[in-house]
Design a protein with these regions (language model features):
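Polybasic/polar functional segments that serve as interface/processing modules
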Residues: 1-120
Length: 120
Protein backbone atom coordinates (compact mmCIF):
# COMPACT_ATOMS: atom_id res chain seq x y z
CA UNK A 1 0.00 0.00 0.00
CA UNK A 2 2.61 2.57 1.01
CA UNK A 3 5.11 1.56 -1.68
CA UNK A 4 2.79 1.49 -4.68
CA UNK A 5 0.44 4.28 -3.57
CA UNK A 6 -2.71 2.33 -4.32
CA UNK A 7 -5.89 3.47 -2.64
CA UNK A 8 -4.92 7.13 -2.22
CA UNK A 9 -7.11 9.83 -3.73
CA UNK A 10 -4.45 12.53 -3.20
CA UNK A 11 -0.96 12.66 -1.71
CA UNK A 12 0.48 15.74 -0.01
CA UNK A 13 4.06 16.25 1.15
CA UNK A 14 4.67 18.47 4.14
CA UNK A 15 7.82 20.06 2.73
CA UNK A 16 10.52 21.14 5.14
CA UNK A 17 11.29 19.59 8.52
CA UNK A 18 8.65 17.97 10.76
CA UNK A 19 9.21 16.70 14.29
CA UNK A 20 8.45 13.00 13.83
CA UNK A 21 7.86 12.56 17.56
CA UNK A 22 4.40 13.96 16.87
CA UNK A 23 1.55 11.50 16.85
CA UNK A 24 -1.82 11.47 15.11
CA UNK A 25 -3.23 14.55 16.84
CA UNK A 26 -0.07 16.62 16.37
CA UNK A 27 0.20 15.79 12.67
CA UNK A 28 -3.52 16.43 12.14
CA UNK A 29 -3.06 19.88 13.73
CA UNK A 30 -0.23 20.66 11.29
CA UNK A 31 -2.44 19.65 8.36
CA UNK A 32 -5.36 21.77 9.59
CA UNK A 33 -3.68 24.91 10.95
CA UNK A 34 -0.34 25.21 9.12
CA UNK A 35 -1.47 24.02 5.69
CA UNK A 36 -5.21 24.87 5.92
CA UNK A 37 -6.13 21.41 4.60
CA UNK A 38 -8.67 18.92 5.94
CA UNK A 39 -7.06 15.97 7.76
CA UNK A 40 -10.45 14.20 7.54
CA UNK A 41 -10.36 14.14 3.72
CA UNK A 42 -10.91 10.41 3.20
CA UNK A 43 -8.16 8.47 1.39
CA UNK A 44 -5.83 11.48 1.24
CA UNK A 45 -2.31 10.65 2.39
CA UNK A 46 -0.26 13.32 4.15
CA UNK A 47 3.48 12.57 4.32
CA UNK A 48 5.99 14.08 6.76
CA UNK A 49 9.78 13.82 6.96
CA UNK A 50 12.13 14.90 9.74
CA UNK A 51 15.74 16.07 9.65
CA UNK A 52 16.88 12.48 9.20
CA UNK A 53 15.64 11.70 5.72
CA UNK A 54 15.74 7.93 6.18
CA UNK A 55 12.24 7.87 7.71
CA UNK A 56 8.81 9.28 6.98
CA UNK A 57 5.40 9.30 8.64
CA UNK A 58 2.10 9.22 6.85
CA UNK A 59 -1.36 10.09 8.11
CA UNK A 60 -4.57 9.04 6.39
CA UNK A 61 -8.23 9.25 7.44
CA UNK A 62 -10.05 6.02 6.55
CA UNK A 63 -13.56 7.17 7.43
CA UNK A 64 -13.69 5.44 10.81
CA UNK A 65 -10.33 6.53 12.19
CA UNK A 66 -6.81 7.66 11.39
CA UNK A 67 -4.08 5.34 10.16
CA UNK A 68 -0.55 6.39 11.13
CA UNK A 69 2.15 4.96 8.85
CA UNK A 70 5.88 4.89 9.56
CA UNK A 71 8.58 3.89 7.10
CA UNK A 72 12.30 3.68 7.82
CA UNK A 73 14.77 2.92 5.05
CA UNK A 74 17.73 0.86 6.21
CA UNK A 75 20.09 1.89 3.42
CA UNK A 76 19.56 5.29 1.79
CA UNK A 77 17.16 8.17 2.25
CA UNK A 78 14.17 9.96 0.78
CA UNK A 79 14.82 12.91 -1.55
CA UNK A 80 12.57 15.29 0.35
CA UNK A 81 11.87 18.85 -0.89
CA UNK A 82 13.12 21.28 1.76
CA UNK A 83 12.57 24.63 0.10
CA UNK A 84 9.06 25.65 1.21
CA UNK A 85 6.93 25.52 4.31
CA UNK A 86 3.77 24.32 2.60
CA UNK A 87 1.95 21.18 1.59
CA UNK A 88 2.85 20.06 -1.91
CA UNK A 89 0.31 17.92 -3.77
CA UNK A 90 2.09 15.34 -5.88
CA UNK A 91 1.00 13.05 -8.70
CA UNK A 92 0.96 9.25 -8.62
CA UNK A 93 4.13 9.22 -10.74
CA UNK A 94 5.90 11.61 -8.37
CA UNK A 95 4.84 9.43 -5.44
CA UNK A 96 6.38 6.37 -7.14
CA UNK A 97 9.60 8.33 -7.73
CA UNK A 98 9.72 9.40 -4.08
CA UNK A 99 9.29 5.81 -2.87
CA UNK A 100 12.15 4.77 -5.18
CA UNK A 101 14.45 7.39 -3.62
CA UNK A 102 14.37 9.75 -6.60
CA UNK A 103 14.11 13.52 -6.40
CA UNK A 104 10.67 14.80 -7.39
CA UNK A 105 11.31 18.56 -7.37
CA UNK A 106 14.02 19.83 -9.71
CA UNK A 107 16.61 22.02 -8.02
CA UNK A 108 17.21 23.97 -11.22
CA UNK A 109 14.49 24.19 -13.87
CA UNK A 110 15.40 23.23 -17.41
CA UNK A 111 15.92 26.39 -19.43
CA UNK A 112 15.57 26.90 -23.15
CA UNK A 113 18.82 27.64 -24.96
CA UNK A 114 18.61 29.65 -28.17
CA UNK A 115 22.15 29.08 -29.41
CA UNK A 116 24.21 26.20 -28.02
CA UNK A 117 27.88 26.90 -27.28
CA UNK A 118 28.98 24.04 -29.51
CA UNK A 119 28.08 23.17 -33.06
CA UNK A 120 27.55 19.80 -34.65
Amino acid sequence: MLYDGSGFKKVYLATGFTDLRRGIDGLARIIRFQFQLDPYDKNTLFLFCGKRTDRIKGLIWEGDGFLLLYKRIENGNFRWPRTQEEALEISADQYQMLMQGLEIVARHPIEEISCPEFSL
